[in-house]
Amino acid sequence: MRADLDALVIGAGPAGSAAAIGLGQAGWRVRIVEQHAFPRRKVCGESLSAAGIELLDALGVGAAWRAAAGPELDRVGWMSRDAQVIAPFPSCAQGRYRVGRALGRERLDALLLERARALGATIEQPARIRAVTGRPGLYRCLLESAGGHREWIATRVVIAAHGSWGPEPDFGSPGTGRGAPERPGDLFAFKANFRDADPGRGVLSVIAFAGGYGGIVEADDGRTTLACCIRRDALAECRREFPGIGAGPAVESALRRECGGLRRALARARREGPWLAVGPIRPGVRVAEPLARGLAGVFRVGNAAGESHPLIGEGITMALHAAALLSRRLAGEPPGMIDEARARAMQEGYALDWREAFSTRLRVAAAYSQLAMRPLLAGPAGAALRLWPGLLTEAARLADKARPAGLPPPLHEEPA
């Protein structure tokens, strides 16, 4: 059996589509399998840093994204029970852009997927990959369409961009622990969009509350995005306090009660669409798991590879950055030459690249999340920020919000 494809990408979020674009620019034959029809809303804070915007330029969608995105985010905010602080956002000293902006995922994901299609990728949507078997250079993947039709397709490598909380295909090797026992500290993520809210133009605010953290920002078309993560035990308490209204509205009610700044921001707001929820989320590093499981030709990207606590709002930028790192590693070898040894070497190099790029962000995000979720820490932090607002600017800088993309010259770059 010969490979029909050079790369099969599982998942058409920012990471999967960006990887497909990068490989398409290098002339690879790529197929993307996405389980949901587009456009679709997604649980996400929806902001993108200056580095992320530059990565979109390299992918060929920067101009379209900038034309649709919300205002420049030149200020950073902190909201808690007793404090509301705003400070200048740290500016990126290198590259074309100084600060980030926000755009809804239903628009971003569609832009990236259509760009991948324009570069020759074939799209199966909605569809799933149920099983993967084989070896680097020749994997057989069981594709199931929405109507239930099944077929086997052959590919040289697999790119797993299916996220971190949903089911993964059967790779014929021990799993990743997604069925771990429930714990009180498990985090569930929620998101809603609002009209007529007032989060402050150009302000990306962090929300600190007992048992969770969140963020609020003005995105495209005047919409406001509110997203948060809440511990399992705190969510259960919310539902007891606000029974009969659903998990999302219960969380919103608790946030309004706990946080004066958020209450003021949403005073005249009306929610657009239902609350969305996913989880439990899985902050941590998983980029090297395929190699440990004997899957040298299966490369993880996006949240499947690893994720930071969402508090720092770097998920999309990290996804695009990781996709660029991976596509450059893969495109360095002719696809027809990929075998076990070459795939293993690329896996090891990519994992090193990934850790070098993101390890600091993950550690800082983990520390910030604990500070925000614990009132005994968040209270003093809010008091300190009121006295010295510049600490908020430096905290954002420490979370790499002003870090340039720092990639080699792209395979293709969109004109400014």
Question: Residue spans of the language-model regions?
Answer:
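Beta1/beta-strand and adjacent pyrophosphate-binding region of the FAD-binding site
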Residues: 2-15
